[in-house]
């Protein structure tokens, strides 16, 4: 809250305490009922690299992560409460591929959060809530900067509450 305005915001917290606050820029229809738009892409320099932040609907727009990538972010964090099914599977292909490209089914083949990392040579962390009864299906994940590297550098959590991790190496993202 600032004055009489409310914002959909998230904080980046590190060992030193609060490193910064990001205010959501792209508001969906539900947000517009109570929140004002943020007006600045936020990123924070940390010991592990430059971290950018998005919230939910921001990540639908490729330009959001692109701006953070152009600001030199190594990692983008996106907290979300996105409803519905927004990833789709692929049944596989009979077309032969060079090793190690997989040809079998992939339930998360069409996942634009996976692509946000690859579009911008960044690690992309997407954290969504799980509440199946109210149409929140989770589909959280940590996605590496190269969607064409196999096996993929990623860690997915489907429709369950869980904690997962992926070792993130930001030392060579400039190439």
Task: Describe the role of every protein-language-model region.
Residues 1-53, 118-162:
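Catalytic-core segment of enzymes that process non-peptidic bonds
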Residues 16, 58-59:
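Alpha-helix N-cap/helix-start capping motif
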Residues 50-55, 76-78:
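Short hydrophobic-aromatic micro-motifs
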Residues 59-164:
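CN hydrolase (nitrilase-like) catalytic-core segments centered on the catalytic cysteine
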Residues 168-175:
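A short C-terminal boundary segment appended to hydrolase-like catalytic domains
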């Amino acid at each position: 809250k600032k004055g009489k305005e409310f914002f959909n915001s998230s904080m980046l917290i590190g060992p030193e305490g609060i490193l910064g606050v990001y205010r959501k820029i792209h508001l969906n229809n539900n947000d517009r009922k109570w929140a004002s738009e943020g007006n600045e892409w936020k990123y924070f320099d940390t010991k592990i690299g430059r971290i950018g932040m998005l919230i939910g609907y921001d990540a639908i727009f490729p330009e959001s992560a692109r701006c953070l990538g152009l600001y030199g972010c190594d990692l983008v964090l996106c907290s979300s409460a996105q409803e519905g099914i927004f990833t789709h599977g692929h049944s596989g292909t009979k077309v032969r591929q060079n090793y190690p490209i997989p040809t079998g089914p992939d339930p998360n083949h069409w996942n634009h959060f996976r692509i946000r990392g690859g579009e911008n040579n960044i690690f992309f962390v997407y954290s969504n809530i799980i509440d199946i009864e109210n149409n929140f299906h989770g589909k959280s994940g940590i996605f590496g900067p190269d969607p064409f590297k196999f096996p993929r550098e990623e860690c997915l959590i489907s429709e369950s509450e869980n904690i997962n991790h992926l070792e993130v190496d930001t030392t060579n993202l400039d190439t």
